Amino acid sequence: FEEREVVKNDGTPYVVYTPYSKKWMEKLSKKDVKHFKSEAFLSKTKKLKKQTTNIKTFDINESNIKPPKVNFNNDVIKNYERDRNTPEIDGTSKLGLHLRFGTKSIRSLVKKSNLSQNKTFLKELIWREFFMQILWHFPETTTQCFKSKYEKIKWRNNMDEFNAWCEGKTGYPIVDAGMRELNKTGFMHNRVRMITASFLCKHLLIDWRIGEKYFASKLFDYEQSSNIGNWQWVAGCGVDAAPYFRIFNPYEQQKKFDKEKVYVKKWISEYDTTKYPQEIVNHKLARERCLKAYKEAVS
């Protein structure tokens, strides 16, 4: 849907996902999702007579990293709610890259996922559009917290700790595995994105904008609206965000979503050896420090 198609009755934008998604689904049920017949535009194309700018003139380098293989079938949709949070399982579609560049139709994905009894996959597509309309209506959120009071947070922004996070050397296995996957493949499992982002903002007290920028430089499926929306969600300063006192415990997250350490061992070759780094911060102390900083900012 376009930016003004799914709004409140008074024409203002939704800033909470649940009522937005309900209105979105109402609109969907009343509207037949049709494909745009792009072939009709072929007759309107024109051949340029003058030489166009060569792509080599831009500061663009070819990557040797192969994008993740698309995994979109009925089983992925049906089992998405069950499998989407387990990084060792190939339970996500990997379609983010194609949605970003328009090589897959959002309409075809909506039609296919809407046929399933399990709507979890469809809800994720709605989240994508929710963040898009937020960025449209509130463009200042590219660099500012949606909730302005969170601008008062006194970030530590320790660059040595930031570099350890970037390199996957924090001493927290699930965090390090995620960052190493990102650096090597240009992709990171969504559950692990939340864990790594939360760790940067809450454990290290590093400004979400710094982490968002790093993800933007690495992710093949980077979309500004989703990236900013999710980083602000994790930091607690965005629309419909997690409360600031929700701080992921990396060890509990690993126990829950990578109990057998399959994902961790895949990306950390030196795991469980003396070569693996010590924790750069104590979880309990980091949690207490974070809560204090946030309370001071919002009080």
Named regions from a protein language model:
Residues F1-E3, R82, N249-Q253:
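Short alpha-helical segments and helix-capping/turn motifs at coil-helix boundaries
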Residues F1-K22, G236:
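Active-site neighborhoods of enzyme catalytic cores
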Residues E2-E3, T12-P13, N227-G229, Y244, ...:
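Generic structural motif recognizing short loop/turn segments at the entrances and edges of beta-strands
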Residues V7, Y17, Y80, W155, ...:
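Short clusters of hydrophobic/aromatic residues that line enzyme substrate/ligand-binding pockets
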Residues T12-Y150, Q253-S299:
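Glycine/tryptophan-enriched, flexible segments
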Residues G91-K265:
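Active-site-proximal binding-pocket segments
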